[in-house]
Amino acid sequence: KQSSNKVNETMASSNQRFQMCLHAFQIISPKIEVSNFELNSSSPSYTINTVRWILNKFPECELSIIIGEDQGALLATWHEFEALQKLVSFICFSRNHFEVNPQIQLIYIDNLNFEISSTEFRNLLNSDPEKAKLMLHPQVFDYIQNNNLYLC
């Protein structure tokens, strides 16, 4: 489902994004499970709901949520953020040096050369598809092309 922070963005459908995740993660490890919990839920897609579901299913696991620094700056606005930060750690890719509340505990990852946001990447798919292709697993890029996703 679409994030409540991105209500008006043109997005792939929920099922299309799920399919892209399946393509992307199947090559990493057969132990990775891509869940459709949020797609099947009738309630809004809040991260806290998904985290609670995962912890109920896998009570022994430790969860981390990987975000870009742009979302790090918005964390305090996330639904039930106070409860969420007690359940997970946040790993934040440092990108554009957004102002992040110093009270929020983030594990920063620097120097990974991800100087592009997801919105900028979707724009790149239109402006320079060959460059965008170099940034994706071939199966994911082919899926995007075959389904005419993110075209302006």
Model-predicted regions and their roles:
Residues K1-C152:
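Nucleotidyltransferase catalytic core that binds NTPs
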